[in-house]
């Protein structure tokens, strides 16, 4: 399994990480959302994992509008949401949407892939439409691997620098997004949402670590990384963010 393929994130990677994502998300933030019928826009929806996690936690009726750049993922996501929910798909730039009439904007593992200007556009769209926003699982730049190795700090730093390529905010994205909403006078709630991976996540740990090392080495080709590493546990730190008008 690879995390990406020629056209974007591989569906197999998204399926592999879904149980860890489900366990990590801060479900208590959902209780802070306004009550009532839901029109939800899921940005960068992937295979629809956010919809599968969130739809059962929101009141009915629900209308979901799924956005992704990858038509393969949109097709998978549209088929996978629970019955009784209205589902539409749109292949579009998630940072250039008219959100009028949207009762909730949501995304998972998206903010750290965006540049400063893209986040500012997204925040302004939410503010203009007065649409609450729930953004989950943004990486914050820290991963703890057990057993530890002397190379881990350099590995983590190189990975974070790779995340910042092309002007992306990477590990700073969640904090920047929170500050932007606050600047507009909104209330922001944040929660830690770490992956806690153990022996039962063997395949996910191996796949994540291969991608982690590959990105770090792309950033710093001379990076020394231990071979045949026997990892037993990994904690990957994320942050969930809820912004309310």
Describe every region a protein language model picked out.
Residues 106:
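A conserved beta-strand element that flanks and buttresses the S-adenosyl-L-methionine
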Residues 113-126:
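A short, conserved alpha-helix within the catalytic core of class I
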């Amino acid at each position: 399994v690879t995390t990406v393929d020629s056209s974007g994130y591989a569906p197999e990677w998204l399926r592999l990480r879904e149980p860890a994502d489900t366990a990590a998300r801060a479900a208590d933030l959902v209780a802070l959302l306004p009550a009532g019928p839901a029109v939800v826009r899921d940005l960068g929806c992937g295979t629809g994992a956010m919809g599968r996690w969130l739809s059962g936690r929101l009141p009915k009726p629900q209308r979901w509008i799924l956005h992704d750049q990858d038509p393969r993922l949109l097709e998978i996501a549209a088929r996978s949401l629970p019955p009784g929910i209205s589902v539409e798909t749109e292949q579009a730039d998630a940072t250039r949407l008219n959100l009028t009439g949207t009762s909730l904007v949501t995304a998972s593992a998206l903010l750290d892939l965006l540049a400063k200007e893209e986040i500012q556009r997204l925040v302004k769209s939410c503010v203009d439409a007065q649409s609450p926003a729930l953004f989950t699982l943004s990486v914050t730049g820290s991963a703890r691997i057990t057993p530890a190795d002397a190379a881990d700090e350099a590995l983590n730093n190189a990975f974070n620098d790779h995340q910042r390529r092309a002007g992306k905010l990477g590990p700073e994205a969640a904090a920047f997004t929170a500050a932007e909403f606050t600047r507009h006078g909104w209330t922001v709630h944040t929660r830690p949402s770490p992956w806690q991976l153990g022996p039962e996540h063997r395949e996910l740990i191996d796949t994540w670590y291969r991608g982690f090392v590959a990105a770090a080495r792309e950033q710093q080709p001379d990076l020394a990384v231990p071979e045949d590493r026997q990892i037993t546990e990994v904690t990957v730190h994320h942050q969930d963010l809820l912004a309310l008008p």
